[in-house]
């Protein structure tokens, strides 16, 4: 009797002519996707490639999709611009990026009650709201308006927001794995947004970068 042995599937990087055209950024050790090229800054076992997503990517104009779940908030805002630029330059025309990141509106609505100053829960609430900003390696939390403007300023087109797991693009549906909290006053616990590469040039928005420097980064770097 002949025994059939299943050969392991060969995985080619996006640089290869037959390579995978879907890249997941910041996947960590547990969110590995079979049909995606899984990347992280750290060389975890079973990921496809360790890479700094804020540095130039080696796959210009090749990718169908880029996906990053709860990754953007771990970057300083200037690093986030670098990441979005490099992802956009790596997408082919019509390719899409999908991001999920905590909603700063939801954090403010759910973490502090604005009761009288002597309210007994204020100690815990104050700790919790700071935890949302600084815990788990967080560097920056986004409002819907800022996230939309940032994507558009970098050069993405057709910027849209979606509910958890939903998309107009079949290949981008059902990707989210992080738990989602209840919406409060219309604000979800995380913003899930997509943008497409189109005719608008992808690049670093000088005016927005100057705003970030003036209103935030200069003060963060100044220390006391």
Predicted regions mapped to residue ranges:
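A broad, low-specificity signal for short, low-complexity segments enriched in glycine/proline
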Residues: 1-2, 8-12, 26-30, 58, ...
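A generic short-segment signal for beta-strand/edge and adjacent turn/coil regions
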Residues: 4-8, 17-19, 37, 67-68, ...
């Amino acid at each position: 009797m002949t025994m059939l042995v299943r050969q392991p599937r060969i995985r080619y990087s996006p640089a290869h002519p037959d390579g995978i055209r879907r890249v997941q950024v910041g996947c960590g050790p547990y969110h590995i996707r079979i049909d995606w090229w899984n990347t992280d800054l750290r060389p975890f076992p079973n990921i496809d490639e360790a890479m700094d997503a804020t540095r130039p990517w080696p796959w210009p104009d090749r990718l169908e999709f880029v996906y990053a779940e709860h990754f953007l908030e771990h970057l300083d805002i200037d690093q986030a611009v670098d990441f979005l630029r490099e992802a956009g330059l790596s997408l082919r025309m019509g390719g899409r990026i999908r991001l999920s990141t905590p909603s700063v509106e939801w954090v403010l609505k759910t973490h502090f009650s604005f009761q009288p100053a002597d309210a007994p829960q204020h100690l815990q609430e104050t700790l919790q709201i700071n935890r949302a900003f600084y815990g788990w390696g967080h560097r920056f939390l986004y409002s819907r308006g800022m996230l939309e403007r940032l994507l558009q300023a970098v050069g993405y087109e057709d910027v849209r927001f979606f509910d958890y797991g939903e998309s107009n693009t079949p290949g981008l549906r059902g990707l989210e794995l992080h738990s989602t909290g209840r919406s409060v006053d219309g604000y979800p616990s995380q913003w899930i947004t997509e943008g497409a590469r189109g005719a608008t040039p992808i690049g670093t928005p000088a005016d927005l970068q100057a705003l970030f420097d003036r209103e935030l980064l200069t003060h963060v770097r100044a220390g006391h």
